[in-house]
Amino acid sequence: AADRALAERRPAVRVDVAAELLGRLHAVDRAEDVPELAALAADQAALLRERAQRFAGPLGADPGLLADAAALLDELPRGGRRALLHGDLNPGNVLADDDGAGRRRWRAIDPKPVLGDTAFDAWPVLAQVGNPFAEEDPVGVLRAHARVLCATAGLETDRVAAWALARSCESALWRAAELGDRDAALADLAQARAWARLA
């Protein structure tokens, strides 16, 4: 039977589990009828630029940070190791199955599959395991978790941080445009600034 036991574990254990799971998931490097990350990221970059013109001022956002995020969305899909990605590997999408012999096997659910740079998949796990942005040193926590995840899953820390910066900015402007949620948008922008210190 599946359970949500991952949410009950310490952040370091949760990062280890996610890293091992990403390593297994990324073993597949091709699939039919799966969208390309490059196309998704290009659409997100265009939308980010349009939304930045409307919301950077009202949010007090750094236009340079938003421009960097859009440029990263254009550039990052051209590099990195290519594989089939989960697309939304957040802690709520990681479940444990008992194999009947008392062993637990972790699995991912609710994928939003795309083909592209494996570093793309790390952001939801790193941003949502524990509460790194509420820590006294969020950059230190992110750095430590990213090192563990990248070492186990075979990812490049700088690429993971760059994707996280870009996706945090995209998320911030989505929250502003689609939800009208200024506080959540500002929180995402603060997270993007933390990721910028790692990228």
List the predicted regions and their residue ranges.
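Short acidic/histidine-centered micro-motifs embedded in hydrophobic/aromatic stretches
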Residues: 43, 125, 163-167
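Soluble or luminal CAZymes and related metallo-dependent hydrolases
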Residues: 13-17, 64-65, 141-145
